[in-house]
Amino acid sequence: MGMEIFDYEDIQLIPNKCVINSRSEADTTVELGGRRFKIPVVPANMATVINDEIAKWLATNDYFYIMHRFAPETRRAFIETMHAAQLYASISVGVKSSEYDFIDDLATNQIVPEYITIDIAHGHADSVIAMIKHIKDVLPDSFVIAGNVATPAAVRDLENAGADATKVGVGPGKACITKVKTGFGTGGWQLAAVRWCAKAARKPIIADGGVRTNGDIAKSIRFGATMVMIGSMLAGHQESPGNILKIDGKTYKQYYGSASETQKGEHKNVEGKQMLVPYRGRLVDTLNEMQEDLQSSISYAGGRDLKAITKCDYVVVKNSIYNGD
């Protein structure tokens, strides 16, 4: 393949001369599908990360969100509720025949979500290409995000089919065991995969999975992501779905992968696991901290907005950024 292989922990970005007086001057906003959002972060469309209330709060506060698809019968009402509140609607769909019926029902009733994410584990598939074409045919005004993929060929195929953005990452997530169960994926080289795919992309890329620190958001931007999808770091909040558990005086919340037994309710083709994540307090505090850290990243990059990060030099420090800890 002749490409550099690295992941988040292998990279350090190199600072440039600072041109702003305070990090609060740094602009972290990003545009996607004709809307501008506060930060280039989207909570994972997983049942332990997002629900109706969180989606509504995010949209009201200028954050991007993608609603999960694990209560499919509620999606039409969700879109109508969001539109009634004069908010944008952003939903997920799969590729089964019932999903075609759902899309056709929306089209017939002129219920048009602003964003539709076609979300399956192996997104470089004829089934995904067919669904992109169908949505673009009957709901041409919806912005279509398709995934998940791991290669430039996949990005090109989905973009050529009509996708407006692609989601990159197969199995690097904390609650994902695709890498262990199948031997396939971007676990351990997710950031290099983002870079590889971004070089081929003509449209935005969403880096999905493997982000463990706020600095990883800046690294994703550096290597070509427009938006970064975050699961485990945005789970475990006061508002998050899932039960609060106390163990040995510590507080946790449940977190599970989208193809886990807990999610599916059956032990078949399981590629996700259930785990506990530390209780993290209020979601707004975490999102504010992400924004502040990204503002600091911009100031280190020597610029005023996210574009500055894309021009930074970097070094590859094979697994050693934590060596001093």
From Swiss-Prot:
One of its GO terms (biological process) is purine nucleotide metabolic process. One of its GO terms (molecular function) is GMP reductase activity. InterPro entries: Aldolase_TIM, GMP_reductase, GuaC_type_2, IMP_DH/GMP_Rdtase_CS, IMP_DH_GMPRt. Keywords: NADP, Oxidoreductase. This is GMP reductase. GO terms for cellular component: cytosol; GMP reductase complex. Catalyzes the irreversible NADPH-dependent deamination of GMP to IMP. It functions in the conversion of nucleobase, nucleoside and nucleotide derivatives of G to A nucleotides, and in maintaining the intracellular balance of A and G nucleotides. Its EC number is 1.7.1.7. It comes from Lactiplantibacillus plantarum (strain ATCC BAA-793 / NCIMB 8826 / WCFS1).
